[in-house]
Amino acid sequence: MDPVDVVGLARTLIDIESTTGQEGPVARVLAEYLRGRGYSVLEQPVAGDRINVIAAVGEPSLVFSTHFDCVPPFFPSRVADGVLYGRGACDAKGILAAQVAAAERLRAAGETRIGLVFVAGEERGSDGAKAANTIASQSKFLINGEPTELKLGKATRGCFRVRLTAHGKAAHSGYPALGESAIEKLIDVLASLRAAAWPSDPELGTTHYTVGLIKGGVAPNVIPPHAEAEVFFRTVGDHDALRHTLAATVAGRVEVDEILELPSVRLHTVPGFETEVFAYFSDVPFLSNWGTPLLLGPGTIHVAHTDHEHVVIADLERAVDLYADLAASLLRG
């Protein structure tokens, strides 16, 4: 059995555009590649021309998993000075190639209890992972791939997104006493958020947030009757504590509408790996049928989604070693 050319496979995948919602072409190429290496492959429909690629040679006790959708804009691969560039180089087509290479190394050594679960849609809604989770599995472990700088994830933070809406009364700006500024009310509330004591966890740290969107007003010479902001919390622990703090902080001055809620996730770790808490989210919560989760991958999240996304080739090759060794250790028990 020929070893996988991890850089070559990564470049093949990177060079097929697969912006979220357009994953069909790359999925079919991947499925055919795995069939050519002797895998039994399921092309699981997700929606429209979107499919997951689920592969194995036996009954898996452990699966490698990551996603092959990417954020826009697409740009093709190139290699320079020992670095692989391209959309998806680190998030997550390079990771996918390393996982395939690790699975093939294990298979060459006689280990056939490895499965592959590669999904669409991680970047927006985790549609592929949700579809994959409808499949019954006997897998005991899930090694999910995201750019972790080759550290094992100890946990990922949760998400809690809200819209804050302030209401006022329109009036001529020359007579402010006749109106009530919704923008000023909203500014006061946002200032209060900065002073609040948000929930914390000894291992995961303190909840933090970003005010990502602000809208309000109708004209410079009109007292604004309406203003709103969207606030995105990266959370730790139980969200009820966050809700309580938020309600006490806004104190009825604005309306609070919840838009998105995803829990923080604690992950399995093993001795010998550096660990870290990651502020981003992953497909892990939506793949609960596939075993106890671990999170590991080459590359850094700090260049994912950028116009210079890349992964160091030495790290990509090191990831193959780590994936194979980690899987073998877990399967030995």
Give residue spans per PLM region.
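Metal-dependent amide/peptide-bond hydrolase catalytic core
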Residues: 1, 18, 42, 153-154, ...
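Acidic/His- and Gly-rich active-site-bordering loop/insert found
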Residues: 1-89, 111, 295
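Short, surface-exposed alpha-helical segments at coil->helix boundaries
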Residues: 24-28, 96, 243-244
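Residue-level marker for buried hydrophobic side chains located in beta-strands
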Residues: 62-64, 143, 169
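Alpha-helical metal-binding/catalytic segments enriched in His/Glu/Asp
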Residues: 64, 82-125, 164-166, 176-196, ...
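Acidic/histidine-rich catalytic neighborhood of metal-dependent amide-processing enzymes
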Residues: 97-161, 201-202
